[in-house]
């Protein structure tokens, strides 16, 4: 018996993002072989998005770029960003998923950031570099991320992306409810 295949392109070569996409799709489609491939995709926004809207647009831009480059069943993009809300600074990620002619946008959980971290970001640094310096780690953005460090490993960047992907997949899982 030949197994059905779902091909997924992720707009990044970051293993955290690729693994999150693969894990989410395996949970959603357990009877399918999930083929996940990452590719470099420009976000068209600053390397460290500092607003909600730039972060969302970065994910959308990455998905659209991937759609123009290669054929797949699904296209995923995850863009991490930061903003200062009424309750203080926080980091979060937007998820953009394209399938056929439909685009779904989701967002991961908000992680409150220490003010000293936010101030370093305002000065032009990227979150991963700030966290590496603060916690004496190396390339944390391709591991547990700020989420893993600040929650003592109880949550990770990958777990946040995985959950956000599953939620953003709702329109594709229930197309009759999302005309």
From Swiss-Prot:
The keyword Cell cycle does not apply. InterPro entries: ITPase-like_fam, Non_canon_purine_NTPase, NTPase/PRRC1, YjjX_NTPase. Substrate binds at residues 71-72. Binds 1 divalent metal cation per subunit; can use either Mg(2+) or Mn(2+). Signal peptide: none annotated. The keyword Manganese applies. Its cofactor is Mg(2+); Mn(2+). GO terms for biological process: nucleotide metabolic process; thiamine metabolic process. It comes from the Bacteria. Its EC number is 3.6.1.73. It catalyses: XTP + H2O = XDP + phosphate + H(+); ITP + H2O = IDP + phosphate + H(+). One of its GO terms (molecular function) is ITPase activity. It holds the Pfam family NTPase_I-T. Mg(2+) binds at residue 71. Keywords: Hydrolase, Magnesium, Manganese, Metal-binding, Nucleotide metabolism, Nucleotide-binding. Phosphatase that hydrolyzes non-canonical purine nucleotides such as XTP and ITP to their respective diphosphate derivatives. Probably excludes non-canonical purines from DNA/RNA precursor pool, thus preventing their incorporation into DNA/RNA and avoiding chromosomal lesions. Homodimer. Belongs to the YjjX NTPase family. This is Inosine/xanthosine triphosphatase.
């Amino acid at each position: 018996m030949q197994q059905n295949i779902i091909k997924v392109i992720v707009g990044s070569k970051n293993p955290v993002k690729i693994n999150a996409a693969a894990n989410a799709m395996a949970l959603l489609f357990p009877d399918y072989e999930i083929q996940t491939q990452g590719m470099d995709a420009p976000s068209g926004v600053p390397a460290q998005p500092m607003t909600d809207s730039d972060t969302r647009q970065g994910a959308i831009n990455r998905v659209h770029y991937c759609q123009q480059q290669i054929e797949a069943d699904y296209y995923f993009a995850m863009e991490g960003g930061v903003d200062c809300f009424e309750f203080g600074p926080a980091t979060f990620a937007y998820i953009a998923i394209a399938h056929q002619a439909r685009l779904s946008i989701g967002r991961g959980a908000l992680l409150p950031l220490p003010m000293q971290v936010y101030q370093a970001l305002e000065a032009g640094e990227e979150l991963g570099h700030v966290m590496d310096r603060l916690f004496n780690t190396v390339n944390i953005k391709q591991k547990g991320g700020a989420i893993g460090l600040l929650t003592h490993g109880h949550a990770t960047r990958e777990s946040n992306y995985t959950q956000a992907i599953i939620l953003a997949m709702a329109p594709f899982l229930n197309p009759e409810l999302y005309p």
